Amino acid sequence: MVSQVVAEEKPQLLSKKAGCNSHGQDSSYFLGWQEYEKNPFDPVSNPSGIIQMGLAENQLSFDLLEEWLEKNPHALGLRREGGGASVFRELALFQDYHGLPAFKNALARFMSEQRGYKVVFDPSNIVLTAGATSANEALMFCLADHGDAFLIPTPYYPGFDRDLKWRTGAEIVPVHCASANGFRVTRPALDDAYRRAQKRRLRVKGVLITNPSNPLGTASPRADLETIVDFVAAKGIHLISDEIYAGTAFAEPPAGFVSALEVVAGRDGGGADVSDRVHVVYSLSKDLGLPGFRVGAIYSANAAVVSAATKMSSFGLVSSQTQYLLAALLGDRDFTRSYVAENKRRIKERHDQLVDGLREIGIGCLPSNAGLFCWVDMSHLMRSRSFAGEMELWKKVVFEVGLNISPGSSCHCREPGWFRVCFANMSAKTLDVAMQRLRSFVDSATGGGDNAALRRAAVPVRSVSCPLAIKWALRLTPSIADRKAER
């Protein structure tokens, strides 16, 4: 009897926050990860395991980072350059949570260099955070009260449902984008989302975009950014531009990466009407492939936002030894320039390997020019063109094919049949294994054969009516013959 009473009272010992289900862990995005962790692929010890294609992690250029560390042992050894005195004591003691000046200066220069110095970052406007997740949440706390809303173009990164909402109480209102124009953001779509928020009696505080897009793998065209900036200026709201994939954009200008701050600076009067309401989130997780270091940043020209975010950053600081190491690494300009160029080349090469492999088995992708993933159209493999059909296909791909990919519904895409497929967290050989598995699945699903009809359709399947998509396809994706010649 006593144990029964205790059992009934236990839930009351936790807060409502601890017991709520808004964290998003029940999303298929996270469920796929759980299945992978139960049965991870290994080419030697577990060759039939699940291949992780749901993780946007850059493992393509670790050798370059390790080579630099071997040449610069002082950085890891916590000594002055040239084998000088130890800095262990000063780093181990309490630090100002504004961050080490040497690191903030190096980070500001690196961010400016990534954008071709079309935007120059002021170190005093940078707030350091424990990754981009902390940066985005801190901005939510700074800009929105409980129940306020941010508009986010779809499809969007599934983790935003956790990062932006769970602890802050903020709401997300999707800006619905469609494959007909390559999922580009339009003013009518923004206006529609704003009206829907008003009908729900939500106060819209801003728009949040990822540029380059996660999950689309596309850098936002300047015209789209101008549309978004015009919208936030007209509504008197904020814009958060999550630019953590800025250094992965492998297309040459004008199809390459354009920062929201560059668009703001190009407005009449230097963007004075909106410059204090446009904020950038950055991290070193994607461009340098260092997610475990937990290094993120908020950049804002709004002094009040910088002050508030700095106070909040005390709950998620970047460790002093990490800052010291990265100050040395980012301070080596010759290295960072060569690293970024080579890393982009490797990303494009692996991207092309995935796109070519999918095309050969009759699966098309949205043409992309950035990121660590492709937005893949597998709708023709579904038994029904519905979200139930999408989930049925997803389960087959995870459990039968052994590939963890992310279904579009987890990214709030309105069109069933799209999937995010990552390519930079595995070797080329593992990607080949994934394509072999998928080919076998497609052959069995379509009755075998050479899938010639499917290959002709994969160009991409639902975006061929968009002139921009065709232009990107011709510019960014080499022919299969070219890829084989390179190999």
Curated annotation (Swiss-Prot):
Gene3D superfamilies: Aspartate Aminotransferase, domain 1, Type I PLP-dependent aspartate aminotransferase-like (Major domain). Its EC number is 4.4.1.14. This is 1-aminocyclopropane-1-carboxylate synthase 1. GO terms for molecular function: 1-aminocyclopropane-1-carboxylate synthase activity; pyridoxal phosphate binding; transaminase activity. Pathway: Alkene biosynthesis; ethylene biosynthesis via S-adenosyl-L-methionine; ethylene from S-adenosyl-L-methionine: step 1/2. The keyword Lyase applies. Pfam families: Aminotran_1_2 (PF00155). Keywords: Ethylene biosynthesis, Fruit ripening, Lyase, Plant defense, Pyridoxal phosphate, S-adenosyl-L-methionine. Belongs to the class-I pyridoxal-phosphate-dependent aminotransferase family. It comes from Oryza sativa subsp. japonica. Catalyzes the formation of 1-aminocyclopropane-1-carboxylate, a direct precursor of ethylene in higher plants. Involved in defense response by producing ethylene at early stage after fungal pathogen infection. Involved in several phosphate deficiency-induced adaptive responses, such as lateral root elongation. Induction: Induced by partial submergence. Induced in leaves by infection with the fungal pathogen Magnaporthe oryzae. Induced by phosphate deficency. The modification N6-(pyridoxal phosphate)lysine is found at residue 286. Homodimer.
